Design a protein with these regions (language model features):
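Acidic, contiguous N-terminal accessory segments
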Residues: 1-100
Length: 102
C-alpha cells in the first residue's frame, strides 16, 4: 500500500473493509468534515496522550478506528484515509498505522 508521505509505522493486516465508494469523490477538506461529523463504519476517539499531530488509524474487517489528541492529528489521519479510500474506491486494506510529523 502506497501512502504519501510514508507513515512512520504501518502494518498490513489480513482482510479488507468497504467504505462507501462515494467518499472517494469528495475533496479532502469535505472528506475531513465528514470524518469529523461521523461516517458509518468510522470511529473517532480522542487520546490526550498522543502528540498534537500524531494519530493512529486502524482498518479492520469490522470498520475503521482513528485516534488523535486534537483536530490536527485527526486531519492527518483523514488525509491518510482519504488516500486509501480514493485509491481503492472505498475498499480498504486492513492495516494499523501510527504516524506523526518527523
Amino acid at each position: 500500500m502506497m501512502i504519501f508521505p510514508q507513515p512512520q509505522q504501518m502494518d498490513i493486516l489480513p482482510g479488507a473493509y468497504q467504505l462507501c465508494a462515494d467518499l472517494a469523490k469528495l475533496p479532502l477538506v469535505d472528506f475531513f468534515q465528514q470524518v469529523k461529523a461521523g461516517i458509518p463504519g468510522v470511529t473517532v476517539t480522542t487520546e490526550p496522550l498522543l502528540g498534537k499531530e500524531e494519530y493512529r488509524l486502524t482498518v479492520e474487517e469490522g470498520g475503521v478506528a482513528i485516534a488523535s489528541s486534537c483536530d490536527e492529528g485527526l486531519f492527518r489521519a483523514a488525509t491518510t484515509l482519504h488516500q486509501m479510500v480514493t485509491k481503492g474506491e472505498g475498499k480498504l486494506e486492513c492495516c494499523a498505522i501510527q504516524d506523526k510529523p518527523a
